[in-house]
Amino acid sequence: MTTKRKPYVRPMTSTWWKKLPFYRFYMLREGTAVPAVWFSIELIFALFALKNGPEAWAGFVDFLQNPVIVIINLITLTAALLHTKTWFELAPKAANIIVKDEKMGPEPIIKSLWAVTVVATIVILFVALYW
């Protein structure tokens, strides 16, 4: 059965998400995928440069020393840290840890995740720089 009644469709602008801070932050957090793609492409180029010998690697290092690339990589690092922060804040909501019949708060989980991240970073830097 068809009807001739026209349903009401509420108008919505394409910038509706800019009105609420929650949605603005959500879009910013989801936008961290773009710098992650940049870093992935950069890493692939690094692997090819490493495979093609010392001259190609030296060219890649020269590319990385370009001030524009340094700024883009700093933006990428900032985006990765923001994504990590929001992910670590989400982790306690997925884990129900009960100690002595009480649910553990999110702070110990978040702090332990950051501690593991810092330790892993220090170990990787030590191996990369001094091994």
UniProtKB/Swiss-Prot annotation:
Membrane-topology descriptor:
Multi-pass membrane protein
Keywords of the record, alphabetical order, are: Cell inner membrane, Cell membrane, Membrane, Transmembrane, Transmembrane helix
Q: Main site of residence?
A: membrane
Q: Which InterPro entries match?
A: Fumarate_red_C, SQR/QFR_C/D
Q: Membrane-spanning regions, if any?
A: 30-50, 57-77, 109-129
Q: Name any GO cellular component annotation.
A: plasma membrane
Tell me a Gene Ontology molecular-function term this record carries: succinate dehydrogenase activity
What Pfam families does its record include? Fumarate_red_C (PF02300)
Localized where? Cell inner membrane
The subunit structure is: Part of an enzyme complex containing four subunits: a flavoprotein (FrdA), an iron-sulfur protein (FrdB), and two hydrophobic anchor proteins (FrdC and FrdD).
State its role: Two distinct, membrane-bound, FAD-containing enzymes are responsible for the catalysis of fumarate and succinate interconversion; fumarate reductase is used in anaerobic growth, and succinate dehydrogenase is used in aerobic growth. Anchors the catalytic components of the fumarate reductase complex to the cell inner membrane, binds quinones.
Q: Which HAMAP family match?
A: Fumarate_red_C
For this chain, the family text in UniProt reads: Belongs to the FrdC family.
Q: What is this protein called?
A: Fumarate reductase subunit C
